[in-house]
């Protein structure tokens, strides 16, 4: 009985801690651009305008300045929260 209670508590603890952690991964190239577009502007429709307006391009700099989303999320893994912080 005591062993099964401890086992259940360990399993519940592992399940809970797994949900609390966001996975960090790398975003490079078109995957980075598409993910940023989804986070900042909603779903990107293919077949529409080929280029984003100038004011949208400036929004990619966001509040993070010139530090660089590529430096932070392509060269090193980052979370979606970090990536979303680049939205203007």
Swiss-Prot record:
Residues 1-18 form the signal peptide. Keywords: Cleavage on pair of basic residues, Disulfide bond, Hormone, Secreted, Signal. It holds the Pfam family Insulin. GO terms for cellular component: extracellular space. Gene3D superfamilies: Insulin-like. It comes from the Eukaryota. Its main location: secreted. InterPro entries: Bombyxin, Bombyxin_B, Insulin-like, Insulin-like_sf, Insulin_CS, Insulin_family. Silk worm has two kinds of PTTH: 4K-PTTH and 22K-PTTH; there are many forms of 4K-PTTH. Heterodimer of a B chain and an A chain linked by two disulfide bonds. Brain peptide responsible for activation of prothoracic glands to produce ecdysone in insects. Belongs to the insulin family. This is Bombyxin B-8. It comes from Bombyx mori (Silk moth).
